[in-house]
UniProtKB/Swiss-Prot annotation:
Keywords: ATP-binding, Carbohydrate metabolism, Kinase, Multifunctional enzyme, Nucleotide-binding, Nucleotidyltransferase, Transferase. In the N-terminal section; belongs to the carbohydrate kinase PfkB family. In the C-terminal section; belongs to the cytidylyltransferase family. The keyword Nucleotide-binding applies. The active site is at 264. HAMAP family: HldE (MF_01603). Coiled coil: none annotated. Catalyzes the ADP transfer from ATP to D-glycero-beta-D-manno-heptose 1-phosphate, yielding ADP-D-glycero-beta-D-manno-heptose. This is Bifunctional protein HldE. It comes from Shewanella amazonensis (strain ATCC BAA-1098 / SB2B). GO terms for cellular component: cytosol. Residues 345-476 are annotated as: Cytidylyltransferase.
Amino acid sequence: MKVTLPAFEKARVLVVGDVMLDRYWVGPTGRISPEAPVPVVRINQIEDRPGGAANVALNIAALGGKVQLSGLVGQDDTADALTRGVQALGVEPHWLVVEDKPTITKLRVLSRNQQLIRLDFEEAFDKHSSDALLNQAQARLDDVDVVILSDYAKGAVGEPADFIASARAKGVKVLVDPKGSDFARYRGATLLTPNMSEFEAVVGTVTSEADLVDKAQKLLQDLALDALLVTRSEKGMTLITPNAPELHIPTVAREVYDVTGAGDTVISALATALGAGAELPQACAIANTAAGVVVGKLGTSTVSRIELIEALKSHQGESGIGVVSEDQLVYALEQAKLRGERVVMTNGCFDILHAGHVSYLAQAKALGDRLIVAVNDDDSVRRLKGDGRPVNSVDRRMAVLAGLASVDWVVPFSEDTPQRVIARLLPDLLVKGGDYKVEDIAGGAEVIANGGQVKVLGFEDGVSTTAIIQNIMSRH
């Protein structure tokens, strides 16, 4: 997946929601308590990390965005620890202090990288406190481009309909990480990011991909939303927007150690990318990559811009999905175009791959984000080149092409020209090597009629499959 990171420092984001402190007690365990059948943990490390909506804000700051944070806290030492934690990492906190409630704290006891127990210290905040918080946050809308409502059902978000309407009226995008079975509270928001269980709690059990899309489209209409991004664990995530094909983004996680805060990372990366000017499909791809990084960490964590860049390099260094059928490629191209990727296509026999081919394909790939190579099958090559050709079977030719870093997809065709397959795939740019005239290139007219372009590239002089074959024969 080709993803370009925007200038995150341009993003101005306000996070409103349930802030909390994630406290970790860590130590070894080597025996069972004589008082009860439970392990004894000898604590030798205590660590506090901002969690919930505060973790969302920290993720934005880690990516380089400017972030303000509004939340409800108690008048206690935990609130002081939370303040120190967010300020140290560049987040501007705006607390509303509720004197008769504690600051929400999640205490986790860990040993050998395993969580043994979690202890929650919390009391739900009432509607009066929530309304006061949303009114306070509303005064900050002129200073931001994106708002995140981070709802953990602890009372901070409450009934946000008026706040959402005010933000949208000012042109501010409102992203919601929802909670509970009543998404109607978020009516009019720009986008919701439920996980699969949260989504099914609202719409019912999803029985298929088509059913997911149908239910999502109905929810979009019922709640007047611009989009839904359903996060699906090992299946990645699915973006649904009105009157457009769904966009499936596969997971990029290599190893999963801890899913704590993964949803926070998704919505924070999404908001930062949108605030920096990224289009929605690109922003979702960025969020998906960020989530793949954070689940490889233990505990509540953030993802830095450098980590995101390295993850994208690693992921995009793969040579795509290789040899595909036409039907597979049609679907892949729909997804690529939804992501805003520029697709380049070329074709040929590529019987004996040589330096000229490699140079030509690298030039072609440099003109876009994705490169398709359509390859004549064996019968087609034989008709074009004569008996004794091809030297290599179509399967071998395609396997070698798919191994090149410049090539994303390789697809065979059986006709003498690729006109039919080009007309079906309709790339953004069709390229051909040699001294062709644009008007003589097979499939060129169809590409141009679809708004695409056709370009002729030069071949490397003195290098050809025919010359290589003749050279081999002359030596033997």
